[in-house]
Amino acid sequence: MKAKSGLCMVLISVALFFGTFSPAKADTLLFPIIVTNYPNVTTIVSVVNRGGSGYFTSSHLRYVYSYKYASSSYSSGCFGASVVMPTWAPDLVSFDASGTLNGGGSLFNDSDIYGGSFAVLPSGAVRSYLLVTNSDSSGNRVDVGYTMALSGEAIVMDILYGAAWGYRAVNDSNREDYSFSSSGISNTLHVGDTRRFTFFPPSEWTTRFFVTPVGSNMNTADVNSTIRLLGFQGSSSGSITGRGSTTYNFNVSQYVNCTAAVNLSDLMDSTAWSGIYYSGGWGWFNNAAGSPAMVYKLEYVVNNATYGGTNNNAFLLSSSDGP
C-alpha cells in the first residue's frame, strides 16, 4: 500500500488508497533516484517536452513523487506527493526537488510562468523516485500519441560539501502510462542478472546502491526486488573477495520495496565486513527475485584531504553491459 498526496498548484490533499488512474495513455518519464535533504542535498531535475504526434502537446505535466525517509527500512513502503504544472512544446524546465534553490520554482531565468513550486517533498533526508506524465489541468493523463515526447536529466548535488553526480531519465519505448517493463527499458537489472563491481576501503569510502524496482502502476503501487551479493564463480552462497584473493562467504539478502539506498555493509556479515574494511575488494551484485530494478552504485568520500576534500562517483549497473 502506498500513501499518496496530490498538489495541484496551490491545493494540497493527502490520502491513503489503492487504485489506478484513467486508462488513457500518456508519455511518462521515470527519474529513478531523487535525493533531497533541505538545505544541504538536492536533486535538480530537467524535463524536455518536444511534443507528441504532430507536435501535439498536453496543456500540463503531472509530477508524481513516491518517497520515504532515509531512516526508513529498505522494506518499508512509500508515501506520495504530486504537483500539476503547465507545459508547452517545445519546452525545457529545470527545478530543485528539495526547494533549496528558488523555493522549488523554475530555475535559470526561465521566462515561462509555472505559478508555483515543484518541490512538494517533506523536509529531512528523503529517498524517492519521480514520474512525469502529460496531463490536463486536473492531473488526469492525456494521450499525445508518441512514447518519446518527454526526456529528462537529473543531477544529485551535495551543496554542503560540494559534490555531484547525474543520470538520464528513463522512458519506456513500448508504452506511455505509469508502468515500466524490461522490454521497454534497456538498462534495468533483470531478475537473475548479476553485475561485477569493485569498491574502495570502507574505512575511507562509503559505498551504497540506490535501488528502484520497476513494474506496473508505479504511481500507486510499491514494486519490490530482493538483492544480494552472489557467490564467487556463481556459488549459491554469497561472497565478497578482498585484495589478496581472500574470499568471505555468507548468506545475506535485502528486500527493497519502492526505493532505497542500500549500504554495502548490509549485504554481508560482520566477518566479511571486518575482512575487507581496510582494503576494499570486489563482488557480484545480484537481483535475486521480484521485479527488474534500476541500480546505481555510488561511492563517495567526505571532507578527506587525501582525496581533495569531498568526491563521489556513481554509475548504472545495467543488463546491457557486462560482466
Q: What function would you assign to each model-found segment?
A:
Residues 22-323:
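Gly/Pro-rich, tryptophan- and cysteine-flecked surface segments typical
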Residues 9-19:
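Bacterial N-terminal signal peptides
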